[in-house]
Amino acid sequence: ANSILAVSMANLVAHSKLVQKYVYELIPNIYGEPFLPVPFMNILNGGAHADNSVDIQEFMIVPHGFEKFDDALRSGVEVYHTLKKRLKDNGLATNVGDEGGFAPNFTSSKEVLDEIMMSIAESGYKPGEQISLALDAASTEFFKDDKYIIEGDALSNTEMSDYLIDLSN
């Protein structure tokens, strides 16, 4: 976001000068009415941020189905603690990675996502309706010789896209 943010801001400032308005006056006209920020909460780490065998760097939950920010935040904390209990109950490590998410050894990213989805449901929330998932794959960390080396496979660009689509299902 570093360069695109600067370009976007420069564009907004230039437009504000052109129409002779302050930037804050333009934002609702361009982007619509302000709305509640949605937290992205990192709850499980892999990749360069953890000493485990998970290739994807960050697995996040996105509590979006709430009217108040504190309800969204609370739901995320509840899922985090449910995940911790589930990990402990399954004999998995509850140590945290560099970014604050748990860093147990799972055998696949799908296994991680399944565990998070079960934690959401066990916490009493509706996966996909109230809380969704997000990934920061940090794929540059496992891109070698024009291939994505993930879970022991060497994937082309198209295969990597297909892999991520499969994960999302």
Model regions: which residues?
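Hydrophobic alpha-helical packing residues
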Residues: 11, 76-83, 87, 116, ...
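Mobile "lid/hinge" segments at catalytic clefts and subdomain interfaces of large enzymes
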Residues: 33-97
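Active-site-proximal beta-alpha loop/turn segments in soluble metabolic enzymes
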Residues: 58-69, 93-109, 138-151
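Acidic, glycine-rich loop-and-beta core segments that form the ion-binding/anion-interacting portion
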Residues: 110-169
